[in-house]
């Protein structure tokens, strides 16, 4: 029903890290090593919380987000409970930012509702059902009268198959008329089939669950967002032809990144007005106006000949660039 705008689910923690490192509250409330290592701290806290759950109570390693952050508080007692609550709130807000309605999942959901089917949402997730409802609502779903089950709350998962049994009992579901839709082959498809539940594999959605190579990428968030454009679910956002796909996956991110940098430079250097020169800067000008027109830096599209523009910038060019422009079969002087 929803997808994320990042390549790996855990890249959300890197996005959180950027906020921890720039907002004054977190800078003053968190020690530098916590901010610098937050993605790994958050991942390891979840591992510890699940292990401790099994050690203390047996059963499945299903936990809630509050229990995950309890582990962070244990290992970093210098953090106040109030600060930890703020970080939990930040994680939920970041989920709202990266989540969006999946078009295929949305169509199935709306069709089921219009056909009068009883819809039940089941998630293997550490977020409580109330937060899951909040996230789905922020993505545009009306789920006010729809039951939502969280493995963290129920302490049983689809991964073990036991969450299906809980839903069947609580909702009085007839197995013969139950159709379960999910993207995880083991948890959503194989385990459901073992119980006699009809299934539909949501193969239109995918994620990479590998580990981020933070030491290789200078901008882990930018890398994650760009790689997310290669996932199946984003095909709904571009036409199915090679040129549109190349524009969406390659040149779109490239130009948007460049214009984002340019807009930031204009602010840093307190530029009053930016001139975008015809015709090479036409697309850059359009992108700037579309996404950065509220940056309070005036801009104008200026018609100018390439020849005069070359002369202005020639001092910054390397020799091979000058030779490329003015060399050729016919001898040319700089004047020509």
State the predicted function of each range:
Residues 1-8:
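Asp-based phosphoryl-transfer active-site loop
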Residues 16-19, 29-90:
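A metal-dependent, Asp-based hydrolase signature
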Residues 84-139, 147-150, 273-280:
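Substrate-recognition element of Asp-dependent hydrolases with the DxDx(T/V) motif
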Residues 125-129, 185-186, 252, 275-284, ...:
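Gly/Ser/Thr-rich loops at beta-strand to alpha-helix junctions
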Residues 159-186:
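Conserved Lys-Pro-Asp/Glu-containing loop-to-beta segment of HAD-superfamily phosphomonoesterases
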Residues 184-199:
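Acidic, divalent-metal-coordinating active-site segment for phosphoryl/phosphodiester hydrolysis
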Residues 206-258:
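Flexible inter-domain linker/hinge segments
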Residues 297-335:
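Long, charge-dense
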């Amino acid at each position: 029903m929803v997808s994320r705008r990042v390549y790996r689910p855990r890249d959300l923690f890197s996005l959180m890290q950027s906020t921890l490192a720039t907002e004054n509250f977190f800078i003053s409330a968190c020690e530098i090593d916590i901010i610098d290592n937050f993605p790994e701290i958050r991942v390891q806290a979840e591992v510890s919380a699940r292990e401790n759950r099994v050690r203390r109570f047996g059963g499945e390693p299903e936990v809630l987000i509050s229990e995950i952050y309890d582990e962070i508080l244990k290992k970093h007692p210098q953090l106040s409970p109030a600060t930890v609550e703020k970080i939990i709130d930040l994680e939920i807000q970041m989920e709202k930012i990266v989540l969006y309605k999946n078009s295929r999942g949305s169509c199935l959901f709306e069709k089921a509702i219009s056909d009068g089917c009883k819809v039940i949402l089941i998630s293997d997730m550490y977020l409580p059902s109330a937060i899951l409802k909040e996230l789905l609502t922020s993505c545009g779903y009306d789920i006010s009268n729809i039951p939502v089950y969280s493995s963290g709350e129920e302490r049983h998962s689809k991964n073990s198959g036991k969450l299906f049994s809980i839903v069947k009992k609580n909702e009085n579901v007839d197995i013969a008329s139950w159709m379960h839709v999910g993207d995880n082959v083991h948890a959503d498809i194989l385990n459901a089939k073992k119980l006699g539940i009809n299934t539909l594999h949501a193969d239109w959605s995918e994620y990479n669950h590998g580990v981020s190579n933070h030491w290789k990428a200078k901008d882990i968030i930018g890398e994650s967002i760009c790689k997310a454009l290669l996932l199946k679910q984003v095909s709904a956002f571009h036409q199915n032809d090679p040129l549109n796909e190349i524009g969406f996956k390659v040149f779109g991110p490239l130009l948007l990144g460049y214009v984002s940098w340019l807009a930031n430079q204009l602010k840093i250097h307190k530029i009053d007005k930016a001139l975008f020169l015809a015709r090479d800067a036409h697309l850059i000008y359009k992108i700037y106006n579309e996404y950065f027109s509220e940056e309070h830096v005036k801009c104008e599209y200026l018609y100018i000949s390439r020849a005069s523009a070359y002369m202005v910038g020639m001092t910054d060019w390397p020799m091979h660039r000058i030779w490329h422009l003015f060399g050729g079969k016919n001898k040319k002087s700089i004047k020509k």
